[in-house]
Every structure is written in C-alpha cells, then in structure tokens.
C-alpha cells in the first residue's frame, strides 16, 4: 500500500510535480492554439466574403471563374482546416493523424500559392477596367500562408506522419489540374493562370510548370513530414 501522502507526491496532476506542470502548460498552449485557429478561420471567411461582395457590387463576379482558382479552392480548405483544428485543439490533447495529414497537404498548397503569386502573378493585374480590393489578395497569398507555416512549426499536439502519406499531397492538385485543362479546352481557352495556357508559350512551357510545381509540392510535403517526425515531442504520437 502506498501512503496517501505518497500517492499525492507522485500524482502526475500534482502542482508540485514537474510532469503535472508540463501537462497543464501543454493544455493551456492547446487552448491558445485552438482560439487562434478559430479566429484565423473566421477571418479568412470574412476576407473571402468581402472579396466576393466587392466583385458583386461591381458586376464582375463570375462564380465559375472565381471558384476555379487554386487560391480560392485552397482558401476554402484552409477555412475548414482552421475551424476543425481549432475545435480539436480545444477538445483534445493532440490532433488526429488524419487531420494532420490534411494539414500537411494544405501547408504545401499554401506555400506554393504564396510562391507562385509573389514570383509570377503579383504584377499581372489589369491596368484598365475593374480594380479589385488589394488587401484580400494579400491576406490569402501572403499572411495566411505565413500563419499556416507558423502553425505547423510551433503548435503542440501534432503527431508524426508516416512517409506513406506523402502521396496524399498530390490528390487535389491532380484533380484541379485535370479540371482546369479540360475547362480551358472546352471554353475557348479560358485558363485560371497564364502559365497553364498553351497559347502563351506552348505545351512545353505548360508541362515544365506542371512538373516543377509537382516536384515543389512533393518536396514541401516531404519536409513537413520530416519535421513532424523529428519534432513530434511525444513517443506516443509517433508512427513508423
């Protein structure tokens, strides 16, 4: 029999026990992360609503065009991931493997979106006609990707991912690419981005961009998985 005093002394929840302090700190950190994720999800939703409203007011909103952009579709994913992630962080001590796999994919999408926009598309705005609000685009192409990366790097409760989950990152981009190329072929050359239009520099250029971006996505996903395995922090969260 362990004396009552002894049981209190080794109780991991005890305020005097370092492990208990760490558990409470971890729970508090998860709550902070949960609140930030929920705020980010709501903020991104409001940003998209304002962008759509701006287009509607100026009579330039085309739902088919708007919701065909990679940025818009992945932003919708990010809203869901932020909200679900916020709820998980508030209710669970760690994220699920399925949710973390989805986060890994959306992390790669966010970084590629930011890179493509800032390197290729930032100055590709019309000099005449409708001038869209600038800040919603900055939020979706700059600030949200930065927050998503930060969330991956520092948020507690992220399980390590198995390498076999690497291919998940390509499921959505392959489907989106097939849709975009088919849409361009049947809509008289309407492509969401100029680098996907074969009329610009030919199919060789299109294929080069596709291969390059695919390699980039896989590399980013591999880095995310490697980071999750290196810094899972808890052996119970690791996978083989």
Report each predicted region and the residues it spans.
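Alpha-helical transmembrane segments of multi-pass membrane proteins
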Residues: 40-56
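Membrane-interface transmembrane-helix boundary segments in multi-pass integral membrane proteins
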Residues: 67-68, 187-223
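Juxtamembrane "helix-exit" motif on the non-cytosolic side of transmembrane helices
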Residues: 51-60, 118-128
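Alpha-helical transmembrane segments in multipass membrane proteins, preferentially the mid-helix core
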Residues: 145-161
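Membrane-interface loop-to-helix entry segments
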Residues: 71-74, 134-146, 207-211
């Amino acid at each position: 029999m362990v004396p009552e005093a002894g049981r209190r002394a080794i109780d991991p929840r005890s305020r005097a026990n370092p492990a208990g302090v760490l558990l409470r700190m971890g729970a508090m950190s998860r709550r902070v992360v949960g609140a930030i994720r929920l705020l980010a999800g709501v903020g991104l939703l409001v940003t998209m609503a304002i962008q759509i409203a701006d287009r509607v007011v100026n009579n330039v909103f085309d739902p088919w065009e708007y919701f065909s952009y990679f940025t818009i579709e992945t932003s919708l994913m990010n809203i869901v991931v932020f909200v679900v992630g916020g709820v998980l962080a508030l209710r669970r001590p760690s994220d699920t493997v399925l949710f973390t796999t989805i986060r890994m994919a959306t992390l790669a999408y966010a970084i590629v979106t930011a890179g493509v926009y800032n390197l290729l598309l930032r100055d590709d705005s019309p000099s005449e006609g409708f001038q869209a609000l600038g800040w919603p685009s900055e939020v979706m192409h700059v600030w949200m990707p930065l927050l998503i990366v930060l969330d991956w790097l520092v948020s507690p409760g992220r399980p390590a991912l198995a390498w076999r989950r690497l291919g998940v990152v390509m499921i959505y981009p392959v489907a989106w690419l097939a849709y975009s190329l088919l849409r361009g072929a049947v809509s008289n050359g309407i492509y969401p981005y100029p680098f996907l239009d074969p009329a610009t520099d030919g199919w060789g250029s299109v294929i080069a961009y596709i291969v390059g971006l695919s390699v980039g996505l896989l590399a980013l996903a591999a880095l995310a998985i490697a980071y999750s395995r290196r810094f899972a922090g808890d052996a119970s969260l690791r996978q083989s």
